[in-house]
């Protein structure tokens, strides 16, 4: 059984955490994650809690993810990769968003940047859609997959519109990770040909038990789970906790391993920068 304060005792399994904001976490968290079997972390660029006012604030943040967090993870034997983008929440400041997106190419060239993200919708606004389209084209230019943030409110409508835009842009759906799915949207994401990400963040998203229900219904093909651990009431060990729940339900080890390792590694390997 997992015991958070004792770090973890768990049957060995390779784990890739495909979405965690480790810049908001402590070194204690890195140590616990390593002991739980997490070998790889993908850290997406996103909102920091306080809306930024200047393009340079984003560039310093991107440098921090690419540089310092990469080294900090390595201290605990964890390989860290990054996704870089202008997030949808702050893209509603059009001038700021344009200035940031204009400079993204120099960050997307970095060899451990493995996707463009998080992009997508927050308020499902025109400004967010404009920023989304520009960054999809950057992903195409750099041969990178997309990590897409689906909105917390009106999620079904938001994902439906995002899929429509991607269809108009003729972006390959096998290179799309539609994240933060719930019971009402998983089927839509999968049917479109995208990968379906799910965030186990019990207070505002889904619990390990709900995630296990989704796996029992939809299987494991093109499915992923993550903690999206950040500065909120989250836990970077939610993937290991969900593994325990899946085992309790009788899901076979090979399927769990595919869900928490093979799938995220296969998706991000489309960048040509991870193996």
Which residues are covered by each model-predicted region?
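Conserved active-site and cofactor/substrate-binding residues in soluble primary-metabolism enzymes
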Residues: 28, 157, 209, 237, ...
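Short acidic/histidine-rich active-site segments
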Residues: 218-236, 256
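Mid-domain alpha/beta scaffold segments of enzyme catalytic cores
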Residues: 2-142, 148, 153, 160-161, ...
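Short, acidic/turn-prone active-site loops that include or flank metal/cofactor-
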Residues: 45-49, 200-205, 229-230
């Amino acid at each position: 059984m997992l015991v958070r304060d004792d770090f973890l005792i768990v049957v060995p399994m390779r784990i890739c955490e495909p979405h965690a904001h480790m810049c908001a976490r402590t070194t204690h968290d890195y140590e616990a994650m390593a002991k739980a079997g997490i070998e790889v972390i993908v850290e997406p660029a996103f909102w920091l809690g306080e809306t930024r006012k200047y393009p340079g604030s984003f560039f310093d943040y991107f440098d921090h993810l690419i540089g310092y967090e990469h080294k900090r993870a390595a201290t605990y034997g964890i390989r860290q990769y990054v996704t870089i983008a202008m997030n949808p929440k702050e893209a509603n400041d059009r001038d700021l968003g344009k200035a940031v997106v204009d400079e993204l190419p120099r960050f997307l060239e970095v060899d451990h940047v493995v996707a463009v993200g998080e992009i997508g919708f927050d308020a499902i606004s025109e400004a967010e859609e404009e920023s989304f389209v520009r960054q999809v084209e950057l992903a195409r230019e750099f041969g990178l997959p997309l990590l897409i943030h689906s909105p917390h409110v009106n999620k079904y409508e938001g994902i439906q519109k995002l899929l429509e835009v991607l269809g108009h842009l003729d972006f390959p759906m096998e290179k799309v990770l539609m994240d933060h799915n719930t019971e009402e949207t998983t089927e839509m994401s999968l049917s479109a040909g995208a990968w379906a990400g799910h965030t186990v963040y019990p207070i505002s998203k889904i619990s390990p038990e709900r995630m296990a229900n989704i796996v029992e219904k939809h299987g494991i093909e093109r499915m992923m789970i993550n903690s999206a651990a950040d500065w909120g009431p989250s836990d970077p060990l939610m993937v290991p906790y969900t593994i325990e729940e899946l085992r309790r339900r009788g899901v076979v080890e090979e399927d769990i391993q595919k869900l928490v390792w093979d799938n995220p590694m296969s998706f991000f390997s489309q960048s040509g920068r991870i193996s």
